[in-house]
């Protein structure tokens, strides 16, 4: 089974934006390379972290940024309320700017703190468990230099700690921070991108005061703060565009603990809860248009592929089809749970947690 099949209708088409034909397209496909005569905007790379358990991963993440063909102006590691870790990073990473999270606990506050400490015209967000290829910034900056483009994201490939389970459906790879089946296979204007490897213009980010600090990832709780940011910027920046590039310039680690059916279910429940919260904040139509398309087109196609695989002798196809049905059902339950409990809740911080 291939995990990279695309929809007949791209997410950009569904959003009413379509595929952009711009001067950066040859950069996005690797056609032009990195020219010395290209005046790239300055970019600050912001990496949030919170635990010493990710120390080796952080080293590899920082090294991948230092190896970029287009150098970053600065690399800022933001430590989320862990003074000992901040001190150690400051000592062990002499070429990195280490700063504390001066906002609310969690990755949204950490990213906002990183932006406040940065100087670049563009801010790039990278997770501490991700590894960028050397052309990551070159490819994405090619898009963000295009008039009207406020931000850009890219394909994130899975770096599995244990073998990928045969039952795991590619349509739900987003639950583990990896790009999922059905995404556009050409540079496309989309509703939102993801913060595991996002570039955004500082001016646009500051226009909406950054991420909501009571809505995002805190420990094992994970809400769609990246989608919320993209929607809020699009609402205030007239004719602004978010770009998606399918170039595989990012790898995201998938710990063995996330390669389980239990994690998939808990993550989907929380995502449904978060989408309901976001619909309340940003409007139902804007917040759920792509999700409704995903549920109506991408998931049924995935179930069909799994059944077809099983008919050809790949019994694991039944597992993938069953997992799609179960995961979608749990996400719907999470959405419904938010609606039931919302009269008694004051803020998103009361969200349930996903299992690690």
Please report, for each region that a protein language model flagged, where it lies by residue:
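N-proximal low-complexity "stem/linker" segments adjacent to membrane-targeting elements
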Residues: 2-64
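Short, acidic, metal-binding catalytic loop of nucleotide-sugar glycosyltransferases
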Residues: 63-72
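Glycine-rich, basic loop-to-helix element that forms the pyrophosphate-binding segment
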Residues: 101-118
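Non-catalytic, C-terminal membrane-associated alpha-helical segments of glycosyltransferases
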Residues: 267-270, 284-356
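Short, flexible, basic/aromatic active-site loop/helix in glycosyltransferases
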Residues: 154, 171-190
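Short aromatic/hydrophobic "clamp" motif used to bind/position activated sugar donors
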Residues: 123
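Conserved donor NDP-sugar-binding/catalytic core segment of glycosyltransferases
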Residues: 135-167
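A short, conserved alpha-helix in the catalytic core of glycosyltransferases
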Residues: 198-200, 204-208, 215-248
